[in-house]
Amino acid sequence: MFAGDSKVLVVTVRDGAGAVVNITGATLTWEAARSTEETTVISKESGDGISITNPTGGVFEVTLDEADTDDLQGLYYHEAELTQAGDTFTVLTGSLVIERTLIRAA
């Protein structure tokens, strides 16, 4: 993705066997940082940037706004955690590449 762009990350939660997990009533947190030892540069949570769009299908969306990525460039680590019935699970990890763009917002 490019700095200053908005993006929606669509995630389907699956168990170890690949079956879809019902996430009804769950809360979610998503964060991005340079590494697991660095300060978080983007943070989203249920109701504030994260929406569960299909609870029985295990689907949630993380919405990144222009301002979230405007001043970022490079490789970032990101992960999402789901809390349900008192248990917390990491349901997504990965890399996020943010490139500079020639056209900048005024």
For the regions a protein language model found, what residue spans apply to each?
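Contiguous segments within soluble domain cores/interaction surfaces
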Residues: 1-106
